[in-house]
Amino acid sequence: MSAPTVVGQRDPEKAWAYKKDVAWYRTELSEETIGPMRPILELYSKVPPESVVEWIKTVRDKAWEVYPYGTIGMFGFLTLSLPTHPSYPDILASLQSGKKTFLDIGCCVGQELRSLTYAGVPSENLYGVDLHQGFLDIGYELFRDSETLKSTLLAADVFDENSEVLKDVEGKIDVVHAGSFFHLFDWDQQVTAAKRVVRLLRPQPGSILVGKQAGDVNAGQKSRPGKLGSRYRHNAESWKKLWQQVAAETGTQWEVSVRELEDKEYFREMTGGVDLAKVKSYGDWNPETTRRIEFLFRRA
């Protein structure tokens, strides 16, 4: 199936957010940033090696017009989350068997799905959900696979209880991946999203939620810069506490593994390369207290 044509989809109420003179819009793209995405683009997508950098920049600027998230401006969509998780070898092996289904929530341009497809996972067993149809369309363009990818890509709002496309996949997923997703919201919104994830997963022991997100040693609601409001940043204990609430409200039980990791490079990546020597804080990011929260919840 051919991907729809991508057109500018700016939110007129947030025109201020699309300016490019901000720290989270990078003009240069290094080989280090491209990283493991280069062989995927060259060998899976058939982008000529000498064209990879300009191809990424061109498609990135189209994605910026859909919505100017930091992960777009900083080329964060090139960074693969799942392959760096300790559970990845086991999850990959189970997916390669062709008997398990996988859903990436907040999938952006579907980079995790293409990585798994490139690694030998049957693409028809892969699902992606994102709020913005434009990102899904741009993913087809970036990876040049609109005629070959068999994955199911859904434009949906996880907070919309009436979403028919999400209802159609409830109870059908073995592994849900959430990379840099939950940290976008406040506590109550995270609980709501987590309960939706519970419904998406198969209602049986062994179903998995895996991922990572930005956290803070001092858990709490954190103000964001400018007009961006606030969101809840967890430490390991508060993230476990939230899932205790989710378990109680859904009548489910979970084996919980959470790690709180100090990672200065993660801070740089997520803030657009802010110089740690020159800042004490950056919006809701603090170089001394920001942590990477890595988690795996397995249904018992």
Swiss-Prot record:
Where along this sequence does the record place binding of S-adenosyl-L-methionine? D130, L131, D157, V158
Going by the entry's taxonomy, the superkingdom of the source organism is recorded as Eukaryota
Q: Name one GO biological process term.
A: methylation
Write out the catalysed reaction. phomoidride A + S-adenosyl-L-methionine = (-)-phomoidride B + methanol + S-adenosyl-L-homocysteine + H(+)
Q: Extract the Gene3D superfamilies matched here.
A: Vaccinia Virus protein VP39
Q: In which pathway does it act?
A: Secondary metabolite biosynthesis
Q: What EC number(s) has UniProt assigned to this enzyme?
A: 2.1.3.-
Alphabetized UniProt keyword annotations:
Methyltransferase, S-adenosyl-L-methionine, Transferase
Listed Pfam families: Methyltransf_25
Q: Its Gene Ontology molecular function terms?
A: methyltransferase activity
Q: Which cysteines are joined by disulfide bonds?
A: none
Query: Biotechnological application?
Result: Phomoidrides A and B (also known as CP-225,917 and CP-263,114) are potent inhibitors of Ras farnesyltransferase and squalene synthase. CP-225,917 and CP-263,114 inhibit Ras farnesyl transferase from rat brain with IC(50) values of 6 uM and 20 uoM, respectively. CP-225,917 inhibits squalene synthase with an IC(50) value of 43 uM and CP-263,114 with an IC(50) of 160 uM.
- Cross-referenced InterPro entries, in alphabetical order? Meroterpenoid_MTases (IPR051654), Methyltransf_25 (IPR041698), SAM-dependent_MTases_sf (IPR029063)
Q: Which family, according to UniProt?
A: Belongs to the class I-like SAM-binding methyltransferase superfamily.
**Function (record text):** O-methyltransferase; part of the gene cluster that mediates the biosynthesis of the antihypercholesterolemic agents phomoidrides which are dimeric anhydrides. Within the pathway, phiE catalyzes the acetalization reaction that converts phomoidride A to phomoidride B. The pathway begins with the highly reducing polyketide synthase phiA that catalyzes the formation of a C12-fatty acyl-ACP, starting from one acetate and 5 malonate units. The hydrolase phiM is involved in the release of the C12-fatty acyl chain from phiA.
Q: How the protein assembles, per its UniProt entry?
A: Homodimer.
Q: What is this protein called?
A: O-methyltransferase phiE
